[in-house]
Regions:
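Short helix-capping/linker turns of helical repeat alpha-solenoids
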Residues: 5-9, 22-23, 29, 42-45, ...
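Hydrophobic face of amphipathic alpha-helices that form TPR/SEL1-like repeat modules
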Residues: 14-22, 49-58, 94, 98-102
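Short coil/turn connectors between adjacent alpha-helices in alpha-solenoid helical repeat scaffolds
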Residues: 21-30, 60-67, 107-109
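Terminal, low-structured helical/coil segments at or just beyond the last alpha-helical repeat
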Residues: 85-126
């Protein structure tokens, strides 16, 4: 059942994000945040792949900043984005806003990577 599977990866991703932020019934826990997003990413869910890339990009969830790993996950996210089921109601604009709100003083490399990723998502037919 596609819908059930879809709900499942969506739920995993939401659980992972709640562990990252702490709240909505989840104690802040970086290992759990990464674990649930990794699982959903492996199942093809674009937003989970984006989240892991976002953690590497921002140096969050207990990960060292690593723009190469961020790019790898964001490329994966873009390749999974094609099917709207795989990114829920997320939009490139929404992700851009989120990236910016967590990264107030991005380096030149960060700005280039961010702009490349958002442009890539925008190029995918809705």
């Amino acid at each position: 059942n596609m819908a059930a599977e879809q709900d499942q990866v969506n739920a995993m991703t939401t659980i992972g994000w709640n562990y990252f932020l702490g709240g909505k019934g989840a104690e802040q826990n970086n290992e759990e945040a990464i674990y649930w997003n990794e699982r959903a990413s492996k199942l093809g869910f674009s937003i989970a792949s984006y989240n892991i890339g976002f953690f590497y990009y921002s140096g969050l969830a207990g990960l060292e900043q690593d723009l190469l790993k961020a790019k790898k996950y964001w490329l994966l996210s873009a390749s999974q984005w094609i099917d709207s089921l795989n990114h829920g109601d997320s939009t490139p604009e929404g992700l851009l806003e989120e990236i910016n709100s967590f990264n107030k003083n991005p380096s030149k490399e960060m700005i280039e990577l961010r702009d490349w990723f958002i442009k890539l998502l925008r190029s995918i037919p809705a």
